[in-house]
């Protein structure tokens, strides 16, 4: 996921996102999640996630933690792009 962060909000956003990700790591089906700084745009954060299966990811996207995060993120984010991929190996 590529997240467009409002200018001047990057550090605060990453701090809040790090706390959110610590919770996600405990969710059933989450095999990996981490944050990456975009090297070409200082206001873009990329989140890489690996889930054991699609139902786990779907459940994550609508759970209470994710709903709470959306209310926090709106103060920092003005756009995001989610790309869902399937492993080929």
Predicted regions and their residues:
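An amphipathic, aromatic/His-enriched active-site/gating alpha helix that lines ligand/cofactor pockets
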Residues: 23-31, 50-84
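Short alpha-helix boundary/capping motifs
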Residues: 14-15, 63
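Short, surface-exposed ligand-recognition loops at beta-strand->loop->(often short) alpha-helix junctions
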Residues: 4-13
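Short, well-ordered beta-strand segments in beta-rich or mixed alpha/beta enzyme
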Residues: 1-4, 34-61
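Short hydrophobic/aromatic patches at helix-to-coil boundaries
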Residues: 85-89
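Short amphipathic alpha-helical/adjacent loop interface patches that line ligand
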Residues: 17, 21
């Amino acid at each position: 996921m590529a997240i467009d962060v409002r200018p001047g909000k990057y550090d605060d956003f990453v701090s809040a996102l790090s706390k959110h990700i610590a919770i996600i790591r405990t969710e059933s089906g989450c095999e990996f999640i981490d944050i990456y700084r975009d090297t070409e745009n200082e206001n873009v954060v990329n989140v890489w996630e690996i889930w054991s299966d699609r139902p786990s990811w779907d459940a994550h996207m609508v759970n209470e933690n994710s709903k709470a995060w959306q209310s926090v993120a709106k103060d920092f984010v003005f756009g995001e792009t989610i790309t869902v991929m399937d492993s080929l190996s």
